[in-house]
UniProtKB/Swiss-Prot annotation:
HAMAP family: SfsA. One of its GO terms (molecular function) is DNA binding. It comes from the Bacteria. It comes from Halorhodospira halophila (strain DSM 244 / SL1). This is Sugar fermentation stimulation protein homolog.
Amino acid sequence: MEFEQVLTEARLVRRYRRFLADVEDASGQQWTVHCPNTGSMLGCTEPGARVWLSHSTRPGRKYAQTWELVELPGEVVVGVHTGRANALVGEALDAGLLPELSGYASRRREVRVPDAPMRADWLLEGHPGGEPPCFVEVKNVTAAVEHGRALFPDAVTERGRRHLEVLTEWVRGGGRAALVFCVQRSDAQEVRPAEAIDPRYADALRAAAAEGVEIRAVRLHPSATGIRPDCALPVHYQEEP
């Protein structure tokens, strides 16, 4: 994924009210931008961190710029825009990084799971080998701890847990479903549930995997020019201390 424009570089002052962040340029001038991430953004909101912003020309928009990237210590760049995760997983599918989900002739976005209060991010259809259609839910991952362990979620997510339960019920009924963690940081080596943050989600993830929901993860490499698919990552179901 290439960014449509040259991103503006700034420094983070603070992130607040979930959807807002204040930034400043080298001269000290400050302004407010849109923060497209509803999580806690654990580890990604240190004041003074280098950030990159995209610009919208849409008329009437209150905040013209959107926070896209943040640089962490060690020159690790993290993509914080959760709205890009679905398209990035689509690119990862095209790049062959999720071979277990390959072979489908088409895919559709935002498709309702039958008899369930949920729209899946993707529906894969038309597998020549006879595989059933596959509902795919995408979760954006930005948090990580030492040794490259990426964690999800970074805040309690009742919605995310309900999505897992819907996918689990779909598989129990004979369907196919997958959850893909979209890890937008190049230092990640694996993905684990953040048990200390949301133990109910961790339990639901393990239950879903045991019932046959396919749990996958893909690493993306963010930079100031774009975000490219990198590699598949292993998923482990226990958070190590």
